[in-house]
Regions:
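A short, proline-enriched helix->beta-strand linker immediately N-terminal to the Walker B motif
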Residues: 147-151
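Catalytic Walker B motif of ABC-type/P-loop ATPase nucleotide-binding domains
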Residues: 153-157
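Hydrophobic anchor residue at the start of the ABC signature
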Residues: 142
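Conserved ABC ATPase "signature" region
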Residues: 59-64, 106-124, 175-176
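Conserved ABC ATPase signature
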Residues: 128-132, 136
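Conserved H-loop
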Residues: 182-188
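ABC ATPase NBD coupling module
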Residues: 61-78, 102, 109
Length: 210
């Protein structure tokens, strides 16, 4: 379960968000600059709320009163950026394995091959991001996240840069891949995407759920 209760003063408005989810896919909708991505960044530890509390599976990640603020690398949160953030000079295999090596995970090769098989990208192991289609890049990015065995997945507008035809195909792929027993937050300004993927839906306007 993910429990979020945060407040952060921003230049345009005050971010004041509270919600909790279990093994659901939560869709956060709203216009650009409404506070959706900032909410994800606070959960991930990229940004720090002014006050509040974030609890993941009973583990306190942030508590302003108790002065708890767990570092990004220790939160076990999977964050997928709009651009997928793949390393252009690394192969698919290297993109997935590099973070595991940094975390000193045992049996890196076994873990990498397992997630590549799971996301049907084994044949792409030695290719580079520029040699991949949009759908393949998305699968690699998800495989890299899942290799870390995160406790929650945060997906920040993963379709924003794609054309409509490709987006339709990838929505179906993503829906299949997200049948997992953990909380997922999907951020989008597209109502159709959220309705298709998500069990729960919240709309954010000027930093508040409406």
């Amino acid at each position: 379960m993910l429990e979020v209760q945060i407040y952060k003063k921003l230049a345009e408005f005050d971010l004041d968000i509270s919600f909790q989810i279990e093994d659901n896919i939560l869709g956060l909708m709203g216009a650009s600059g409404s506070g959706k991505s900032m909410t994800l960044k606070c959960i991930a530890g990229i940004e720090t709320p002014d006050k509040g509390r974030i609890v993941l599976n009973g583990r306190v990640l942030f508590d302003s009163e108790k002065k708890i603020n767990v570092p990004i690398q220790k939160r076990n949160v999977g964050y997928m950026f709009q651009s997928y953030a793949l390393f252009p000079n690394m192969s698919v295999y290297e993109n997935i394995s590099v973070g595991l090596k940094a975390r000193k995970v045992k049996d890196v090769d076994i873990v990498v091959k397992k997630v590549m098989k799971q996301f049907q990208i084994s044949e792409l192991a030695q290719r580079y991001p520029k040699q991949l289609s949009g759908g393949q890049r998305q699968r690699v990015a998800l495989a890299r996240l899942m290799a870390y065995e995160p406790d929650v997945l945060l997906l920040d507008e993963p379709f924003s840069a794609l054309d409509e035809d490709l987006k339709e195909d990838l929505l179906q792929e993503l829906k299949n891949e997200l049948q997992i027993s953990k909380p997922v937050i999907f951020v989008s300004h597209n109502k159709e995407e959220v309705n298709y993927l998500c069990d729960l839906k919240y709309k954010i306007k000027e930093g508040k759920i409406i």
